């Protein structure tokens, strides 16, 4: 696991119109989040905070249990989740893209399944409230409908009645 450092800084890159995380002299993470999506605090306090570091490590340790991703992928997922949680403005719910979950098994994990008219895919819940959850797309590309898609790690808010549990046999089939 890449250890968080007080030297890490969030960078608002006008050239790329993206939020970057400067990890060291040789490494930067380019997020899919555009500058207009960022909170004002991103511009005022660019340092990776203790709160950022704690959340990053919590997400990393949670995801490692699934044994689905290599350490570099875990780091990338965790850092993008941290950016969404602390650097993005609130996103509006766009639940109409997703089918309601009508099953009886409740979702108890933060890695969930969402199903659009075009496909099903895995998402990570970054923030949860009683009505809705902010999630990031874990697939390379997730087709919402014929015209719209989400790039990897793009955030979307959905009503909780759209959240499908990730079934254990699905997880085990990916591990094998």
Swiss-Prot record:
List the GO biological process terms: division septum assembly; FtsZ-dependent cytokinesis
Could you tell me what this protein is called? Cell division protein ZapC
Which cysteines form disulfides? none
Q: How does it assemble?
A: Interacts directly with FtsZ.
GO CC, sorted alphabetically, is: cytoplasm
| Lineage, opening ranks | Bacteria, Pseudomonadati, Pseudomonadota, Gammaproteobacteria, Alteromonadales
> What UniProt keywords apply to this chain's record, in alphabetical order?
Cell cycle, Cell division, Cytoplasm, Septation
This molecule's function is given as:
Contributes to the efficiency of the cell division process by stabilizing the polymeric form of the cell division protein FtsZ. Acts by promoting interactions between FtsZ protofilaments and suppressing the GTPase activity of FtsZ.
Keyword Cell division among record annotations = yes
Give the UniProt family note.
Belongs to the ZapC family.
Q: Which HAMAP family match?
A: ZapC
Q: What InterPro entries does the record point to?
A: ZapC, ZapC_C, ZapC_N
Q: Which domain of life is it from?
A: Bacteria
Q: What is its main location?
A: cytoplasm
Q: Where in the cell is it found?
A: Cytoplasm
């Amino acid at each position: 696991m890449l250890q968080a450092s007080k030297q890490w800084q969030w960078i608002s890159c006008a050239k790329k119109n993206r939020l970057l995380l400067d990890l060291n002299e040789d490494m930067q993470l380019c997020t899919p989040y555009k500058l207009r999506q960022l909170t004002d605090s991103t511009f005022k306090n660019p340092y990776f905070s203790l709160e950022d570091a704690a959340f990053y490590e919590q997400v990393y340790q949670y995801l490692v249990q699934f044994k689905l991703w290599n350490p570099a992928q875990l780091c990338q997922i965790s850092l993008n989740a941290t950016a969404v949680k602390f650097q993005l403005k609130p996103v509006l719910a766009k639940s109409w893209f997703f089918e309601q979950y009508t099953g009886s098994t409740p979702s108890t994990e933060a890695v969930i399944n969402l199903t659009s008219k075009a496909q099903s895919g895995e998402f990570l819940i970054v923030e949860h409230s009683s009505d809705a959850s902010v999630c990031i797309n874990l697939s390379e590309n997730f087709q919402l409908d014929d015209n719209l898609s989400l790039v990897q790690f793009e955030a979307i808010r959905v009503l909780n009645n759209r959240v499908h549990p990730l079934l254990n046999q699905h997880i085990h089939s990916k591990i094998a």
